[in-house]
Amino acid sequence: MSLLASLFGRKTSAPVARDRLQILLAHERSAGEGQSELIAKLQEEILAVITRHITVDQDKVQIKMDRGAGVSMLEIDIEVPELKARAAPQAAAAIK
């Protein structure tokens, strides 16, 4: 499957997500201050995508929006648990 993806130039999810985020932030910047609902929805959707793949403690998520002269930056800090600790019990259960 990776051979087909490399032949047809399929983007991985990270660049696609980055492109979408850049488009949304550009739209929000051009619309002005009245678009706080868009940023709130964007934050919810980003967290929903991340929690589909890893367990996230909601208390350890920090979201910050900075607006400058021509740049808006959405910063999301998430403390990710160690993946090895989660994988070990699952591997042990599979052996039994």
From Swiss-Prot:
An example Gene Ontology biological process: regulation of division septum assembly
Keywords for this entry?
Cell cycle, Cell division
Any keyword Endoplasmic reticulum?
Answer: no
Any single Pfam family the record assigns to this protein:
MinE
Q: Does the keyword Cell cycle apply?
A: yes
* Domain of life of the source: Bacteria
Which family is it part of? Answer: Belongs to the MinE family.
| Function of the molecule | Prevents the cell division inhibition by proteins MinC and MinD at internal division sites while permitting inhibition at polar sites. This ensures cell division at the proper site by restricting the formation of a division septum at the midpoint of the long axis of the cell.
Listed name of the protein: Cell division topological specificity factor
Task: Tell me the lineage of the source organism.
Answer: Bacteria, Pseudomonadati, Pseudomonadota, Alphaproteobacteria, Acetobacterales
